[in-house]
Amino acid sequence: MKQFIVFILSLYTTLSWAVLEVTIFKQEENTFPIVISDFFVVGDASQGKVIADIMRNNFNRSGEFSVVNANYIIRSKPSFDKWKAKKIEAIVLGKLEKISKKIFNVEIELLDVYSKKTLYKDIFTVHNSGIRRIAHYLSDQIYHALLGKRGFFNTRLAYITVINKDKGEREYRLEISDSDAQNPQTILKSREPLLSPVWSPKQDKIAYVSFKNSRSEVFIQYPFIRRKIQKLPYFDGIASSPSWHPNGEILLLTLSKNGNKDIYSYQLSSKKLTRLTIDMGIDTEASYSPDGNKIIFTSNRSGQVQVYIKDLKTNKINRATFKGRYNAQAVFSPDGKSLIMVHKIDQDYRIALLDIATKDLKVMTNNQLDESPFFSPNGDMIIFATNQGGFGVLSVVSIWGRQIFELTSKVGEVREPNWSHYLK
């Protein structure tokens, strides 16, 4: 059945020089060999090649596939024996038909080389502005058909770029991009620091911290509609570390309104503020579990910097980390079974994965200054900020510990990454 796909456009300008450079680290073992053919195009259009190229890049970037370009257009049933001899396991065929100046039909078919069966097939009508989005969407569908789990391609990133200006000044930019770091848009520029951008569950807004009024305050930005930036009330003292409830209506905040940093929840519609932790220590960096029934936060209440979990139904607080003297910036995995965090080893800050049930802690990186880890929405990837040669970059590893790709900027340092949920 043909589907018509409508995609939301950002109100902000895409700047080619702001595109992050993606360095993919080759994966030699246990990858799935797949052919993605150039699309057969009906009418004068270059969009067929664009879709195929985006899809190839997506699968190469996944760390789970080795992608082969057929170097020619496969229009119908391919020679399965030929591809089987090359140890190819699946083939993607595509067709793009130009309906009008900016409207296209996009057909896709995924074939299993060994069974010779169609694993996925569909047709869509799409506007020219949605070409990139349909390529990501189709990548997710094929990923699921082959591996039985959701992909992460039809998602977005948010991050902060820091640019050194003349006379020692700096410019801070809140930026967003597609998951492949393409289609970047600068949402906000500031001479004062910007921190902690975090997508709402519906991907319609971003909460972040700004020092524009010479103090740490939380704001909400709407990238895709014309709406004024929303500033949360001034709560006295510091406001930091925003994090969304799964319903998108509540924010977790770190506030020092009573002289000490504690965790609060703030209901956006009712403006109700609720204190969730009361301790003489510093409580900060809180985030919700996927079901919204628990929060995780960093605290020095034990005399060390450790991670704690609070059950919001029972109000019981349990310490989650015991290995090492410093564990911080933890977030739940999408299935709620694991935590990703910053773990200190000697003088190095690295990314570590904790199994909540078994308490098994696995160090994922071998860097010196890792920070701000966050899961991809399918839970298979972890994006984080790190330092390479004194320069801030973003890096992505799989939950199996393989470095997949790195994101760098030509114009400045990149920090504070956040990965959106799935786009609707």
UniProtKB/Swiss-Prot annotation:
Query: Keywords in UniProt for this one?
Result: Cell cycle, Cell division, Periplasm, Signal
Q: Name one GO biological process term.
A: cell division
* Lineage, top ranks: Bacteria, Pseudomonadati, Pseudomonadota, Gammaproteobacteria, Candidatus Pseudothioglobaceae
Q: What is this protein's function?
A: Part of the Tol-Pal system, which plays a role in outer membrane invagination during cell division and is important for maintaining outer membrane integrity.
Protein's organism? Vesicomyosocius okutanii subsp. Calyptogena okutanii (strain HA)
Q: Which gene encodes it?
A: tolB
Q: What is this protein called?
A: Tol-Pal system protein TolB
GO cellular component assignments? periplasmic space
- Which domain of life, per UniProt? Bacteria
Recorded hits in Pfam families, A to Z, give:
PD40 (PF07676), TolB_N (PF04052)
